[in-house]
A protein has these predicted regions:
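Gly/Ser/Thr-rich loops at beta-strand to alpha-helix junctions
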Residues: 394-400, 565-573
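Hydrophobic alpha-helical scaffolding
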Residues: 347, 351, 391, 395, ...
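Catalytic or ion-translocation cores adjacent to nucleophile or general acid/base/metal-coordination motifs
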Residues: 410-460, 520-562, 569-653, 714-715, ...
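Generic recognition of flexible, low-complexity loop/linker segments
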Residues: 367-381, 549-554, 561, 685-692, ...
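Long, charge-dense tracts
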Residues: 12-454
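Structural beta-strand/beta-sheet cores of well-ordered domains, especially the beta-sheet scaffolds
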Residues: 387-389, 416-418, 559-562, 594, ...
Length: 867
């Protein structure tokens, strides 16, 4: 049985059609879908449009920070927040009670609040029953008048066309379908958690369900229903419009898109993951063929089955002439977002919060400049010959370590650069079954770097351990092992408490690179079967080394005897978000392989000769070294120590001791946020640590300029630091290149924290406590929930949502030219997703971007552009 016939909507004869691969991947001509009334519904084109409003978050292993509201980037920031709130049912700003608490704590000052009120006006408060004559009365009204909390209303998925099944027919389809659909998806996409993998994994999702229905001894409800058999044999381009015509009504094709959007947003996590894997199938190590079209087809079939069970096969459509017209969708041009009074007040508080931080941040930098120019500074001696130079990732967590390291010796210099250090590659360690990407997400690397283990006995030992692990999970051998060696598991449990790194669930970037293995970075001209080149040519290496040195301004400084590239990673146990704690510029991987590779490149004599022809001279007395900093344990791992010349051994030992002291001070500084910690507890005695670190929490600013702007200045681990010498960039080309790389990465980190803190349940993942890992691709609440996107509250609870304050050291003319070099950069600053400022350091003038110009800030003025 299929959908019942009617005089107006004839049912086409079912056909067995194998669904084609996604048009985005195969490049095939798109199939259009014919509705029962003869009109055409372009399913694939429609789903491509709708996918824009879904979360764009890949599997856990590739967790990369991004702008949560990327789909609204074309709108000004505040308008985007309002539109997204109406679409997803999320908070637009923090609750008013939270802002009032921040005000009482001094995080919002009267000065900042007064400036915001004078600029934005407050007369509208009188119209809402709070008569005010000056800014103080307006402040008092904001503190005392009951405006509400600004609690968001329901999203489009809870009050749209599809929700009429519940509101008008009394059907709760979600509760009946979601658990079955999610289990099906989890089983099909599983990447190694399930002991028994999904059969027929080479098939597409729809073909997989067909095969199960036809061959399984047990019914796969609801898809095994006789009513759905004809629909199950159709391609999605046929079945989807056929079912929608019954649900929405024939001739109502404009509403098909709306129904599909509401259905996808009802489980946005799974929908977004399916779309990500459709356009990026390489995101799974064990690839699967999934598509939004097949997901929609399966869910609509399930809905149709349950609707027919409850209402019969003849039922009225959800929309008809007697139904009220549906309002425009929040992302459509005709939709006009109107803030509530509570949201208007919250916007004033939010602007005052950002202005308070901005005034404090800029004031510290100007005070630091005054001290430096007075000659009383002891932390920065520009005429002092460098003894050691260390390159760090521009990551905000590395700023405090750089400061503590520089404090050990005025001749120690540090530089900030994107943590992949220009080495765009995939990396495959000695124990890795698959290579992993180690460069920014938008790049498509063509080079592979491998490790080769020097000791073959370790390979044999690793293989034996893997075999024992597999055998322990089989029926017979697992039973024998548990009966004979089961007691050992209790001993291992106790050991894992006192030494957590023994836990098999531990993830550590220090173990990602085998310091005892050899790494080869040089290659010939042969390309491997999978399309990667095994290493780099000398010319390619020279390009990458020169790129780092030139962009950082080091070509204008003499090179020290020892130059260290310090990547960063992390270590944690049973943490699904381990990739979020590693280097974002390395696609959520530790930066150790990149640091090691660029050091090996810079030490090659052939590369140095090529660099010398380009004017980048590396003296023979200079040696490069790679290292990795574990930001959670504050430990350092060095690579290729056996290759360090004897002439540099004493200096290396001095540097290692300096780093040990710096990391001890850094760990102490990190602990200051734990208000109840006892100063008498030794870190080695604190074996229980519920939060390995706060990651990028509290990030708020980014400086692109010389180190002398902030050397010796504590920026509270809230600032990204990228090295740049404006004197070497008269045309702004280097700055434009840096901005194009830094703004999406740092801005994405900032905004993901912003929105995950703003609404921990819609934009964030909520508390980690009920989380379970689903198939190694995502996390869910409980056992049958939607995939959760964004960040958990344990990573954001100390974060204040502030838009990134980006300050570049450059003249206003060049700063403006650089940021207008690409349409994406213009979108970031013109729509107020970040705050863009420049500092003419010599003249001590600061400027802010406002509507295509750089406007000078008056002394003492905080911020002006509000987005």
């Amino acid at each position: 049985m299929g959908i019942p016939r009617s005089d107006k909507v004839p049912l086409p004869t079912p056909q067995i059609i194998t669904p084609p691969a996604s048009p985005l991947l195969a490049g095939r001509k798109e199939a259009t879908s014919q509705a029962p009334d003869g009109s055409f519904f372009p399913l694939q084109e429609t789903l491509r449009r709708l996918a824009r409003w879904l979360p764009h978050q890949g599997p856990l292993k590739d967790f990369i920070h991004h702008n949560t509201l990327h789909a609204f980037a074309e709108f000004p920031f505040v308008e985007a927040c309002l539109r997204a709130s109406r679409l997803y049912g999320a908070w637009t700003f923090l609750p008013l009670s939270t802002y009032r608490e921040l005000y009482s704590q001094g995080a919002i000052t009267d000065q900042a609040l007064a400036e915001v009120l004078f600029e934005g006006g407050y007369e509208w408060m009188s119209e809402l029953g709070a008569p005010v004559d000056d800014w103080r009365q307006a402040r008092d009204a904001m503190l005392s008048t009951h405006w509400g909390e600004g609690t968001p209303g329901p999203g489009i998925a809870q009050q749209g066309l599809r929700s009429r099944w519940k509101s008008q027919r009394g059907l709760r389809l979600e509760h009946r379908i979601a658990p079955k659909l999610f289990r099906l998806l989890g089983q099909f996409l599983d990447q190694g958690i399930a002991m028994w993998g999904a059969p027929h994994s080479e098939l597409s999702l729809l073909q997989f369900v067909r095969q199960l229905v036809e061959s399984s001894w047990l019914p796969l409800r609801p898809w095994s229903s006789a009513r759905l058999r004809p629909l199950l044999q159709m391609a999605p381009e046929q079945s989807v419009p056929l079912i929608l015509s019954r649900f929405v009504g024939p001739g109502a094709e404009p509403l098909y898109e709306r129904y599909l959007l509401e259905m996808l947003l009802a489980h946005a996590g799974w929908s977004g993951m399916v779309w990500e894997l459709e356009i990026h199938p390489e995101g799974l190590l064990e690839r699967r063929r999934v598509s939004l079209a097949e997901l929609c087809a399966l869910e609509l079939m399930a809905e149709y089955e349950y609707v027919c069970l409850d209402l019969g096969e003849v039922f009225p459509a959800l929309h008809g002439p007697q139904q009220a017209a549906l309002p425009p969708l929040p992302y459509e041009a005709e939709f006009s977002p109107s803030p509530t009074p509570a949201e208007q007040v919250a916007l004033l508080w939010q602007r005052a919060l950002e202005r308070t931080y901005r005034s404090d941040f800029l004031g510290k930098l100007r005070e630091r400049r005054s001290v430096s120019l007075s000659g009383h500074s002891t932390v920065c001696k520009a005429d002092l010959a460098p003894r050691v130079q260390a390159f760090f990732c521009l990551d905000d967590r590395e700023g405090s370590l750089r400061r503590h390291f520089e404090a050990q010796n005025p001749a120690y210099e540090t530089y900030g650069f994107a943590g992949f250090f220009g080495v765009d590659c995939v990396f495959q360690g000695v124990d890795d079954a698959f290579p992993s990407k180690h460069c920014p997400a938008p790049l498509h690397p063509k080079h592979r770097i491998r490790e080769q283990r020097r000791d073959s006995r370790r390979d044999a030992r690793s293989l034996r351990q893997h075999e024992v692990h597999d055998h322990s999970h089989t029926l017979v051998r697992g039973f024998l092992l548990s009966q004979t060696l089961g007691l050992w598991s209790a001993v291992k449990l106790v050991l894992s408490i006192f030494k957590p790194s023994l836990n098999p669930l531990a993830s550590s970037s220090l173990q990602r690179v085998d310091a005892e293995a050899a790494m080869t970075v040089h290659r010939g001209d042969d390309q491997e079967e999978d399309g990667f080149f095994s290493g780099y040519t000398d010319a390619e290496m020279a390009d990458r080394v020169a790129g780092v040195l030139e962009a950082s301004g080091l070509v204008a400084r003499p090179l020290a005897g020892l130059v260290i590239f310090v990547g960063h990673g992390s270590s944690s146990i049973n943490n699904p978000y381990f990739a979020a704690y590693d280097c974002g510029a390395c696609s959520g991987k530790g930066g150790g392989p990149n640091a090691r590779a660029v050091a090996l490149m810079a030490n090659r004599p052939q590369v140095r000769r090529l660099l010398a022809r380009r004017g980048v001279v590396i003296p023979d007395s200079c040696w490069f070294l790679g290292a990795l900093h574990d930001t959670t344990r504050d430990e350092m791992q060095y690579y290729d120590l056996e290759s360090v010349p004897a002439s540099h051994r004493n200096l290396l030992e001095e540097v290692r001791q300096a780093f040990e002291q710096a990391m001890a001070l850094n760990a102490k500084e990190r602990c200051r946020r734990f208000a109840n910690i006892s100063p008498k507890i030794d870190p080695r005695d604190a074996i229980f640590e519920p939060r390995p670190e706060l990651n990028h929490a509290t990030n708020a600013a980014c400086i692109i300029g010389r180190r002398q702007l902030s050397r010796g200045l504590s920026l509270d681990r809230r600032c990204f630091l990228s090295s740049y010498d404006p004197g070497l960039d008269p045309q702004g080309k280097i700055l434009a290149s840096l901005l194009s790389a830094i703004v999406p990465v740092c801005g994405g980190i900032n905004l993901e924290y912003y929105f995950s803190r703003l609404d921990p349940t819609v934009y964030g993942a909520g508390s980690k406590l009920p989380h379970n890992i689903q198939g190694l691709i995502g996390v869910i609440n409980g056992t049958e929930g939607d995939l959760l996107t964004g960040l958990p509250t344990q990573m954001t609870e100390v974060h204040d949502p502030l838009r990134l304050l980006l300050l570049v050291e450059q003249s206003p003319e060049i700063a403006l030219r650089a940021v207008q070099s690409g349409p994406e950069l213009v979108c970031w600053v013109e729509n107020g997703w970040i705050q863009y400022l420049c500092w003419d350091y010599g003249a001590d003038r600061m400027y802010e971007y406002q509507h295509g110009t750089m406007r000078q800030l008056e002394l003492g003025q905080g911020m002006g552009s509000e987005g």
